[in-house]
Amino acid sequence: MAKHVKVAVTGAAGQIGYALLFRLASGQAFGLDTTVDLHLLEIEPALPALKGVVMELEDCAFPLLRNMVVTSDPRVAFNDVNWALLVGAAPRKAGMERKDLLEKNGSIFAGQGKAINENAASDVRIFVVGNPCNTNCLIAMNNAPDIPKDRFYAMTRLDQNRAIGQLALKAGVDVPSVKNMIIWGNHSSTQYPDFYHATIDGKPATEVIRDKNWLLNDFIPVIQQRGAAVIKARGASSAASAANAALDSVWSLINTTPADDNYSVALCAQGRYGVDEGLIFSFPCRTENGVVSVIEEIEHNEFGQQKLKETLDELREERDAVEALGLI
């Protein structure tokens, strides 16, 4: 029997939104057996541009796209949705401190969390792309007390995909040869791209890529700073690759994970790996019959433990900052 899903996308007229919507409407996230309603949220000044995007979506005549709602009201956007993809966020501008960005986005995500809590379908799942995504997700989660905490996710799949791409290039193999590439912690420059547990053609990555200096001193910083490198080269932030990673994430959260692999997503820590209860932290995950679970038996060497501490400390600082602002 055909399935149907209602999906809210915030920041729908932005660059990531533009790269995301056409692929969503074509079935790339929810499958070719699932029809889609799109609820598109934008700020008032961007509504004319969003109407242009809607015209283009109509002009594609996607068989799976049933209905579209265009609005600047979060209550309308999140009404009865099964998925909320929180893409829109205030960008960091020159001279802006991270705490300023947290405050500006905090009010946005607090409001959206409340609107989701009051209006979304009972089975809603929330996936945050807008940065700083871990802490924006934390804010939304804390403002939606009626929704189970395990329904909130933040995107680190872009980091995972970046890491897989770099390992494949270095090893001279095709991308599908690289598996179990884990991103731990925050989607920021403190993230820990864990090559120690990655495999290449079924062997430990460290056996295939024997250049330890490259792994430690080139690979990790490249992944941690890839977003900034894209901005420097392109003059704009990652859009198509971010949209692609969001689609990959939704697919992985819904569909059973292959037995020999895992995927990375940030979710509510629930005390795992010594991470504070309630923080949104990226872990290796698997999906089985629609149930998402964290892989819990992974052990870290001293280097890995230090990297986990660095990213955890940053997430604690961000939490404390938004707590002080009264956002959670």
Swiss-Prot record:
Molecular function in Gene Ontology: L-malate dehydrogenase (NAD+) activity
Signal peptide: none
PANTHER family reported in the protein's UniProt record: MALATE DEHYDROGENASE
Similarity-based family: Belongs to the LDH/MDH superfamily. MDH type 2 family.
Function of the protein: Catalyzes the reversible oxidation of malate to oxaloacetate.
E.C. number(s) listed in UniProt: 1.1.1.37
UniProt-recorded name of the protein: Malate dehydrogenase
Source superkingdom: Bacteria
Reactions catalysed, as given in the entry: (S)-malate + NAD(+) = oxaloacetate + NADH + H(+)
Alphabetical UniProt keywords: NAD, Oxidoreductase, Tricarboxylic acid cycle
